[in-house]
Amino acid sequence: MRDFMAIGRSVAVAERGMAATSHPQATLAAVEMLKAGGNAVDAAVAAVAVQGVVEPQMTGIGGDCFALYSPKAGAPIALNGSGRTPAGTDAGKYSGSGARDIPPTAPEAVTVPGAIDAWCRLVADRSEERRVGK
């Protein structure tokens, strides 16, 4: 039996897929996605969506997403799902003001979260690779 007071992790062995997160429910979501025929991206998105519920202080739909994915064929893919400036922002207001930085507590420092768009792009772009677990 595992001693949860001891430092370290349990040994994990798998033949067809593996998932690890900071929360058991998120890991279970990833494993279930793989069992259902999803690929690594599907599993990662399922896990992070669950983490937004079970660990909202750590991750969620209001944040960003950065991914480096290496498909079986082709070059690795990098995705920058960082927040964007709102569409109605006037860039000239900032460049002509002489300000060097936007104060972090100013309303202008807020970005539109990029996580959900990044998750959707990752899943859509990898849809042809849904063969893991079958």
PLM region descriptions:
Residues 1-28, 32, 40-134:
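Noncatalytic scaffold domains of N-terminal-nucleophile
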